[in-house]
Amino acid sequence: MADAPIAVLTEGNGRVHVVHLIDDSVKIKGIGVLNPYTTLNDVGMGEEVQIGSKIFTRLPPRLPELVLGMKRRAQTIGSKDAGVLIARLGIGAGDVVLEAGLGSAGQSMHLARTMGSSGHLITIEPREEHSSVGLENLSTLSKALPEFPKHDHIDGRIEDSFDRIKEVSNDVDAILLDLPEHPSAIQAAAPLLKIGGRLSCYCPVSSQLE
């Protein structure tokens, strides 16, 4: 599954499914039991395919579809907010970006698309149950994009990870914090910024703190 190509299927109601084209019989939530490779490999982009009683349309695996079909555990940053943060921080190709609070990787997916193969994305997440989902989503995205940044992930809190960050990059162009508490994280992360670098804080809603 790790090396299987990606297919995107959409339903008439707009629901999106991201399918790994493995050559084996599997049960996929919302679709049913099928062999993804034999069922979908010869279906062209824009063509319809019937699986069970449902009709699906195959689309190219682009960022909007992959975000809609991503696995979720933590509440994700939406595309609108992700775009604003990327623009305000001036993030682009070749940048080194640190994101603390990987979660399900909604923000990281937008970052990866923007940064391209010349960028370097560093993610930090203290909760393994969240990072496992986020890293899987990033792995899926890496198979779909023509370019994907260098990626280093650190398990732990940003306040405790300064030395580990320095091991992979001496400094960073931008920092994004999506955490319940920001003051201590800002104090820990700010010294990593290059001159002219920028830092943003995304404040969680109450449900994320529960």
Region locations from a protein language model:
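N-terminal auxiliary segments of SAM/dcSAM-dependent transferases
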Residues: M1-P60
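Helix-to-beta-strand junctions that scaffold the AdoMet/dcAdoMet cofactor pocket
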Residues: G92, M115-G116, L193-G197
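Short beta-strand element of Class I
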Residues: S118-I122, L199
